[in-house]
């Protein structure tokens, strides 16, 4: 259940706040680059 909630929260945040969504996308991109 925690995985489902963790997946839905970012999507909800991006839908409500595009600016926050951009920041999250940048963090995810950086995380993938580090890996």
Curated annotation (Swiss-Prot):
Expressed in basidiocarps. There is a cross-link at residues 11-18 (Cyclopeptide (Ile-Pro)). There is a cross-link at residues 12-16 (2'-cysteinyl-6'-hydroxytryptophan sulfoxide (Trp-Cys)). Processed by the macrocyclase-peptidase enzyme POPB to yield a toxic cyclic octapeptide. POPB first removes 10 residues from the N-terminus. Conformational trapping of the remaining peptide forces the enzyme to release this intermediate rather than proceed to macrocyclization. The enzyme rebinds the remaining peptide in a different conformation and catalyzes macrocyclization of the N-terminal 8 residues. The modification (3R,4S)-4-hydroxyisoleucine is found at residue 11. The modification (3R,4R)-4,5-dihydroxyisoleucine is found at residue 11. Residues 1-10, 19-35 form a propeptide. The keyword Phosphoprotein does not apply. GO terms for molecular function: toxin activity. Coiled coil: none annotated. Keywords: Hydroxylation, Thioether bond, Toxin. InterPro entries: Amanitin/phalloidin. The keyword Coiled coil does not apply. The modification 4-hydroxyproline is found at residue 18. The typical symptoms of amatoxin poisoning are gastro-intestinal distress beginning 6-12 hours after ingestion, a remission phase lasting 12-24 hours, and progressive loss of liver function culminating in death within 3-5 days. One of the few effective treatments is liver transplantation. Major toxin belonging to the bicyclic octapeptides amatoxins that acts by binding non-competitively to RNA polymerase II and greatly slowing the elongation of transcripts from target promoters. Belongs to the MSDIN fungal toxin family. This is Alpha-amanitin proprotein 5. It comes from Amanita exitialis (Guangzhou destroying angel).
